[in-house]
Each structure stands twice: as C-alpha cells, then as structure tokens.
C-alpha cells in the first residue's frame, strides 16, 4: 500500500532506516525531578502537590498524576499542612518565601544547573551589577531566575532586543541565559551584547546545560544524514522545540510529536532515512513507541548513531534517601 493516508503498511521507502540520535531523552535533572515526586509520594502518601508541571512532558505528568501527584500553578491551591514540590524549572524567591511562611513541607526539584544560575544572579546583584538574561518570556525557568532579585534584571529574546536595550551603567553589566536555549541562537545574542557592552561579564561556564548542548550537537550530526527528523517532545518543552529548529536550520523537514499516533504517514512517505531524537524531558518509552509506529509504516532497520555517553547524576534533597522511601 502506498497511500499516505494508510494507517499502517509500506509507506516509507523499501530500504528505509531509522537513525537514532545519541544522546536523546531524559537528562540528569529530569531524572532527579521525577524521582523526587515519586519518593515524596512513597514517603508521605498521596496527594503530593507540585507547583507547575514537574517537567514539560505530557506523558510524564499524566503518569505522576496516576501515582498521586496534583499539579497546581499557584501555591494558594495547596492546602495548608501539605507537601509541595517545586518543578525542575525553579521558582522565584517570592514563591519560595510564601511556601515557607505558610509552613508547607517543601521539596525542591529545581535542576541544580538552574540553581547555579540563581546563585550567579544573586551574587552579581549583591555587587551592584545589572544582569541581562537571554531567554523566552513567560517560560517558568525565566520567571524563576528573573524573580531571584527585586530589580536590575533585563530580559532579551533576540538581537533586536539587544539593540533597544539601555542600561544605567554599561560598565557594570553581566549576562546569564536560560539553560534550554538554542546554542547557536544564544551565541548570536551574546555576540550582540558584547558588541554593545564590551565590559559585559559572562559566567565562568556557560549557562546552557550539558544535556541541551549534547542533544543539539547530536541533531546537528544526524540531520544532514536524514530526509526527515522526528523529535519526541511536548509542545511546551523548550529544549524539544530547539531540537526541531536545529534540524530545520540544516534544511531538513522536522516534526515534534507527543505520541506515536501523531505521526502523519505523509511525513515519511518515500523517505529513506528518518532521524529520531527526544527532548531532555521525553522518556525513552515514547521514543521506542515512535520507532514501533515507524516500523508499522514500513521502516525495518534501526541504526543508533555514535555520540556522547552521559554519566551525570545529581543528589536528591535531604529527607528523600533510599531507606526513607523504601
């Protein structure tokens, strides 16, 4: 069968193969955040409240709901005396203070690499330095980082924003970035900031996290070998969206799916090489489900590409040790 409307059967080219990006899927921060929720439920019983989606992935959130997690956007939705978990994206100082004042039991699932940026911001503001943050307006990580201090933060999303930016003292300025940005886009904006503010201070180590960079590099390597790329990730996942953009910028059609049934057979019709990757918040079970769906469409071979092997882990918060959660 050759119709692109076919639900299964031979749609892809007869010799089609799947190329699997390496690395892909969960990063250490996401693994840690999910484990924090699961252990908190095991220790304290359901329900456990989580402020914002623990990570931006529908499958993960729905799975944790079944286990007893309740996701809220504001602390006022958490009844007094209950447990609240801050999502991997981090929260503002005001949210943290409110939770403490209300006497809520707090577990902080903020990714340690996001916390590193929070520490940088607080330190530089204590020194009287204005801070330019490169990030996406409205993203919870950006709101959390901007909310570490009361003033002196300036958000830019583009080179054009940099052109319009005016600061009180161009000699006392520093930059930080959202951890899930496009490495290439961030580099362009950083270049514009350096040109406009030559004295601008950069972090000793870039804020874009290792997992974001590794997954983008893997797509840069994979995309030129592919006729089409499928990214496993939810629409509200910043890092997953960046992977799709990275492939598209290399001239390859790229699509993002939350579930295998979202794959349009027309995407792979007649295609010989189909790249598959997954955002840092997307579980491997979804990537494997996508592979299974592509097999239904006639792809018989799967080839894992070479790439970086990640061996990163982060410690859990105090009180969530193995013996307590057993």
UniProtKB/Swiss-Prot annotation:
Catalytic residues (positions): 141 (proton donor)
Cofactors (names): [4Fe-4S] cluster
Pathway(s) this gene product operates in, as recorded in its UniProt entry: Isoprenoid biosynthesis; dimethylallyl diphosphate biosynthesis; dimethylallyl diphosphate from (2E)-4-hydroxy-3-methylbutenyl diphosphate: step 1/1; Isoprenoid biosynthesis; isopentenyl diphosphate biosynthesis via DXP pathway; isopentenyl diphosphate from 1-deoxy-D-xylulose 5-phosphate: step 6/6
Manner of cofactor binding, per the entry note: Binds 1 [4Fe-4S] cluster per subunit.
Source species, domain of life: Bacteria
Record function comment: Catalyzes the conversion of 1-hydroxy-2-methyl-2-(E)-butenyl 4-diphosphate (HMBPP) into a mixture of isopentenyl diphosphate (IPP) and dimethylallyl diphosphate (DMAPP). Acts in the terminal step of the DOXP/MEP pathway for isoprenoid precursor biosynthesis.
PANTHER family hit by this protein: 4-HYDROXY-3-METHYLBUT-2-ENYL DIPHOSPHATE REDUCTASE (PTHR30426:SF0)
HAMAP family named among the record's database cross-references: IspH
NCBIfam families: ispH_lytB, PRK01045.1-2, PRK01045.1-4
Record-given protein name: 4-hydroxy-3-methylbut-2-enyl diphosphate reductase 2
Species for this entry: Burkholderia mallei (strain ATCC 23344)
Organism classification: Bacteria, Pseudomonadati, Pseudomonadota, Betaproteobacteria, Burkholderiales
């Amino acid at each position: 069968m050759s119709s692109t409307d076919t639900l299964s059967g031979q749609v892809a080219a007869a010799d089609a193969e799947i190329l699997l990006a390496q690395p892909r899927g969960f990063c250490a921060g996401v693994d840690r955040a999910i484990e924090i929720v699961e252990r908190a439920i095991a220790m304290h019983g359901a329900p456990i409240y989580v402020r914002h989606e623990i990570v931006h992935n529908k499958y993960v959130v729905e799975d944790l709901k079944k286990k007893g997690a309740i996701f809220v956007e504001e602390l006022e939705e958490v009844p007094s005396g209950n447990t609240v978990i801050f999502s991997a994206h981090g929260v503002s100082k005001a949210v943290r203070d409110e939770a403490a004042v209300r006497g809520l039991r707090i577990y902080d699932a903020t990714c340690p690499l996001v916390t590193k940026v929070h520490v940088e911001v607080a330190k530089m503001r204590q020194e009287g330095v204005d801070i330019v943050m490169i990030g996406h307006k409205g993203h919870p990580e950006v709101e959390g980082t901007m909310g570490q201090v009361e003033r002196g933060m300036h958000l830019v999303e583009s080179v054009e924003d940099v052109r319009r930016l005016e600061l009180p003292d161009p000699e006392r300025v520093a930059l930080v970035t959202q951890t899930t940005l496009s490495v290439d886009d961030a580099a362009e904006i950083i270049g514009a900031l350096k040109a406009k503010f030559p004295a601008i201070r950069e972090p000793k180590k870039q804020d874009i996290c290792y997992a974001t960079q590794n997954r983008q590099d893997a797509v840069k390597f994979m995309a030129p070998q592919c006729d089409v790329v499928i990214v496993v990730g939810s629409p509200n996942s910043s890092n997953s969206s960046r992977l799709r953009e990275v492939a598209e910028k290399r001239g390859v059609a790229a699509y993002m799916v939350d579930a295998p049934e979202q794959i349009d057979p027309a995407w792979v019709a007649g295609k010989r090489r189909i790249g598959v990757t997954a955002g840092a918040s997307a579980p491997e079970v979804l990537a494997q489900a996508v592979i299974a769906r592509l097999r239904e469409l006639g792809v018989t071979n799967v080839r894992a590409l070479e790439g970086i092997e990640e061996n990163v882990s982060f410690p859990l918060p105090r009180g969530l040790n193995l013996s307590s959660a057993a």
